[in-house]
Amino acid sequence: MALLLIIPISLVTLWLGYTLYQRLRFKLPPGPRPWPVVGNLYDIKPVRFRCFAEWAQSYGPIISVWFGSTLNVIVSNSELAKEVLKEHDQLLADRHRSRSAAKFSRDGKDLIWADYGPHYVKVRKVCTLELFSPKRLEALRPIREDEVTSMVDSVYNHCTSTENLGKGILLRKHLGVVAFNNITRLAFGKRFVNSEGVMDEQGVEFKAIVENGLKLGASLAMAEHIPWLRWMFPLEEGAFAKHGARRDRLTRAIMAEHTEARKKSGGAKQHFVDALLTLQDKYDLSEDTIIGLLWDMITAGMDTTAISVEWAMAELIRNPRVQQKVQEELDRVIGLERVMTEADFSNLPYLQCVTKEAMRLHPPTPLMLPHRANANVKVGGYDIPKGSNVHVNVWAVARDPAVWKDPLEFRPERFLEEDVDMKGHDFRLLPFGSGRRVCPGAQLGINLAASMLGHLLHHFCWTPPEGMKPEEIDMGENPGLVTYMRTPIQAVVSPRLPSHLYKRVPAEI
């Protein structure tokens, strides 16, 4: 019995000693008082970015939050974001990898979970110069327009069917199919879901792999922050090995199909898998890196665009004035006898402002993935010890009344008054990050979101379900790394163009 008491007392004593040492040696940012062992884990509310923003109101724009024994520093304004992402970028460019992230990424052999160093620089160069180059994005544009027009076709068929006339439509389902098919076609050259919504055999396996990966990662969540608890939550080596083998088996099969197709045709297509296989020797890319990069694209692109568009549509239904103004611009530029293409974007400034304003108020990833300090560094006059994690609260930065007029108001006109970049150059608006770890696919995400919004608004009018006022729409968020609406948006849809403009425009590339 005495031994059972000694162990937890010793652990608590060690933790208190370590915390005291950190506080005496370093001038740490202020924050809520941590509890022994667990730190602030039990004080954090489910929607973390809102919780951290509330704490910033009490303690200031830079705060310390302890996840168990790990110091996490949260910054919540644009000046501090600039320090983290520009002035001290290289010192804060490493990545904290949980045990599950380490397994999924083969210890950082991909891009997202790689530490800053020669490997990261190499694979980022591949992404920037090869995978997401303007030339490749333009070559793959027909895929995006195919999937967006397929969505329009699907929404039209749903809302004009006899049994659905006048009823609300659950938009998330249609947005999710676009995002899913778009990213799998870009990455793998595969459309796993057909026009009837039926998923093929490889698609079923792909979806199962994604869901199993999420399940495995979630099973270790608490133990990641409290190392001495890991004996209670052991890493299931067998389960992770089985998952990795399953993922690799599917990916290798797709890679083999593309290799064989290149041999027969004598040339490569523009899909990411073809590009990586073609560039393998030039950049000395291992198979682990190719597989890791492909799954990075899937992970980063499968949900985020659909989430952004759902939030934007919710705001447009709540703000009919803005919806009407976008439609007037679309009618003026495109008319009522053709459909929009990405070539029209430059003539649709208000649509682009709506896209920006939605991403300002509702960034799909409201907390940046943590940047790990690879050396001791000062931010905002406080010490950030080596090994600490630094998070930028993108959501709080974009709602800061010190830099935004009426920050809680959905007002796209603000971007007509001042052109604000959202690809990492203006630290007030950071939906895609900034600095060495800025998202290389930012332009792809912007183009797809603007295309989806433009088509939905050009083809249809959107109103709340019968009996609901616009202001009654639930604008709360679900907890999680990405921010779904707590209540999926439902709306009554009315077509506004001639019926022949609601057909899918297929692209076989």
From Swiss-Prot:
Cellular component (GO) terms are:
membrane
By sequence similarity, the record places it as follows: Belongs to the cytochrome P450 family.
Q: Does the keyword Protease apply?
A: no
Q: Taxonomic classification, please?
A: Eukaryota, Viridiplantae, Streptophyta, Embryophyta, Tracheophyta
What EC class does the entry list?
oxidoreductase
Which E.C. number(s) belong to this protein? 1.14.-.-
Compartment(s) where it occurs, according to its Swiss-Prot or TrEMBL record: Membrane
According to the UniProt entry, its GO molecular function terms are: heme binding; iron ion binding; oxidoreductase activity, acting on paired donors, with incorporation or reduction of molecular oxygen, NAD(P)H as one donor, and incorporation of one atom of oxygen
Spans through the membrane: 2-21
Please give the Pfam families that the UniProt record associates with this protein: p450
Where is heme annotated to bind? 439
Q: Which cofactor does it need?
A: heme
User: Which CDD domains does this entry report, sorted A to Z?
Assistant: CYP98 (cd20656)
Classification via InterPro entries: Cyt_P450, Cyt_P450_CS, Cyt_P450_E_grp-I, Cyt_P450_sf
What is this protein's record name?
Cytochrome P450 98A2
| Entries under SUPFAM superfamilies matching the protein | Cytochrome P450 (SSF48264)
Q: Keyword Transmembrane helix: yes or no?
A: yes
Q: Which UniProt keywords apply?
A: Heme, Iron, Membrane, Metal-binding, Monooxygenase, Oxidoreductase, Transmembrane, Transmembrane helix
How does this protein sit in the membrane?
Single-pass membrane protein
UniProt xrefs under Gene3D superfamilies = Cytochrome P450
